[in-house]
Amino acid sequence: MRIENLQNENRKYAKSIGNFHVLEYVQDASVSPMNAMNEYFMSKMNVRRRQVVIDIDKDHSAIIQAGSMQWMGGNVQATSGVKGIGDFLGKALKGAVTKETAVKPEYVGEGCLVLEPTYKYIILADVGKWGSAGMTIEDGMFLACDANVKSKVVARKNLSSAVLGSEGLFNLSLQGNGVAALESNVPEDELIEVILENDELKIDGNLAVCWSSNLEFTVERSTKTLVGSAVSGEGLVNVYRGTGRVLMCPVAPTTSLFESTNSMAAKAAAKSSNTFGK
């Protein structure tokens, strides 16, 4: 099988890592006179449709979020990845607590797999570079990964981080060697990468997109005393300790695409955060 014009003047690979590619539409050419102006300015502001393209062969199979496949070419088949009723129940529980689909199909064979288009921003992450413990991601970010990458649910180590941290009780952790495609509410170049070496990072609000799974995450007062916190007006902060990496979004909360890209909604969503709410 040969695809002649997957890339052209209007469709280009914006980023590639290994057998994963981000196909970006420079502009939406399928417009009417009613929406042409909106589509024009959307393109200028980098609001574009994007698709993940995955090359499948004997050395590379892929696991994707259920329902995200648009088309596939070549000798590519989907398998459920479910090994029995116990495995299905375990995956259903994992999906319920991480806002992901219960069963993520695995695609094997030889050919090309293309996922549904999205206006979200696609981050291609080399999971192996996050260390042996892997990376923990925000709920709902997972889109696809190499089959060599294993996923598991990690729980908060203490009650404070779960109840007060606005990050949920459980998150999805990815571990192994391979590429993961993540859906982000903001562009990758707006994210700040913080490298910790036996150090700590304090963040006011749910701004962390993903972090090394071996980092200790707690919620603490910004100062040592209640009086100090009250006077400073900072209150509680999310604290990441240890050695690893954190990707954070300093311009908007990570809760939804609408809240991240609409300034008024961002302020409303983060009204308890000094960064955006005041």
Labelled PLM ranges:
Residues 1-278:
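Composition-driven recognition of glycine/serine/threonine/acidic- and proline-rich low-complexity segments
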